Amino acid sequence: DDNSFRTYGKGYQPEERDNWRRENVNKLIRELKHTIVKTKEWVRFGISPFGIYRNKKSTPDGSGSNTNGLQNYDNLYADVTLWVKKKWIDYNIPQIYWEIGHPAADYITLTEWTKMLMTSTCTSGRTWLAR
């Protein structure tokens, strides 16, 4: 990671390494979407990321879910909401394996948060989420 950051992290300060990592993942997702559309525009591209995007306590504006666990954005460098908003992915099926009532990551809390994200960005008015 240190060698890669020194070699390819031009324009980023050492304290911005997380942003550099996220941008590398964003570039992969963006380029995959572009290649798929260019090659076979009818193919749909989706992601099945970890179930927690961000915990509420990690977001300055409180927009994260009311959870307490590993996070896509902060720990895995996956900015899933950006991909949805930029329409780089056609669908998002997070890996939500916690049970209803789980103290750190309640199933209902996570599915409702994901539904809110997808509904607010879905132009067709349809979402994938069913309960």
Task: Describe each region flagged by the PLM.
Residues 66-67, 94, 98-100, 105-131:
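C-terminal soluble interaction/assembly domains
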